[in-house]
Amino acid sequence: MLPMITGFMNYGQQTLRAARYIGQGFMITLSHTNRLPVTIQYPYEKVITSERFRGRIHFEFDKCIACEVCVRVCPIDLPVVDWKLETNIRKKRLLNYSIDFGICIFCGNCVEYCPTNCLSMTEEYEFSTYDRHELNYNQIALGRLPMSVIDDYTIRTILNSPQTKNG
């Protein structure tokens, strides 16, 4: 009879332990019910990017002096700079400037080291396309400024920074 009583006691202890574990899991689930959802409904909602976000590169053709510093500091030698030497004024004249965003790693070295600040990072990050050759931007495509997410009335913007509590 003694083994039967110890068996019932072990069964009772295991039942209580299982109920405690189930209760702990349920309490964790209940603690998450008051939180805001983390998922963003992407095409209709967008996160406002931070100030230092490295998106598509914007290029100003008039400021460029064709020094090719951007090519030298790029880890993958990506920007293609075509220029012609004007012998009468002894200066380089920029003919073509292009960047293939299918290869670009968005490190920002070209923007940081440009002596004339003709390159800047924008908040544009949508590069989806069916043909990867459309990701090769010339100076005309690089010169276009993207539409700001904040100005787009069809999209609800969500702040990226965590909300701080005063108190």
Curated annotation (Swiss-Prot):
Start and end residues of each 4Fe-4S ferredoxin-type domain: 55-84, 95-124
Enzyme class: translocase
Cofactor comment: Binds 2 [4Fe-4S] clusters per subunit.
Protein residues bound to [4Fe-4S] cluster 1: C64, C67, C70, C114
Binding residues for [4Fe-4S] cluster 2: C74, C104, C107, C110
Domain of life where this protein originates: Eukaryota
Reactions that this protein is recorded to catalyse: a plastoquinone + NADH + (n+1) H(+)(in) = a plastoquinol + NAD(+) + n H(+)(out); a plastoquinone + NADPH + (n+1) H(+)(in) = a plastoquinol + NADP(+) + n H(+)(out)
Entry's Gene Ontology molecular function annotations: 4 iron, 4 sulfur cluster binding; iron ion binding; NADH dehydrogenase (ubiquinone) activity; quinone binding
SUPFAM superfamilies documented for this protein: 4Fe-4S ferredoxins (SSF54862)
Compartment(s): Plastid, Chloroplast thylakoid membrane
Cofactor: [4Fe-4S] cluster
EC number: 7.1.1.-
Topology relative to the membrane: Peripheral membrane protein
GO terms, biological process: photosynthesis, light reaction
GO CC annotations on file: chloroplast thylakoid membrane
Function: NDH shuttles electrons from NAD(P)H:plastoquinone, via FMN and iron-sulfur (Fe-S) centers, to quinones in the photosynthetic chain and possibly in a chloroplast respiratory chain. The immediate electron acceptor for the enzyme in this species is believed to be plastoquinone. Couples the redox reaction to proton translocation, and thus conserves the redox energy in a proton gradient.
Family: Belongs to the complex I 23 kDa subunit family.
Protein name: NAD(P)H-quinone oxidoreductase subunit I, chloroplastic
Species assigned in the record: Lobularia maritima (Sweet alyssum)
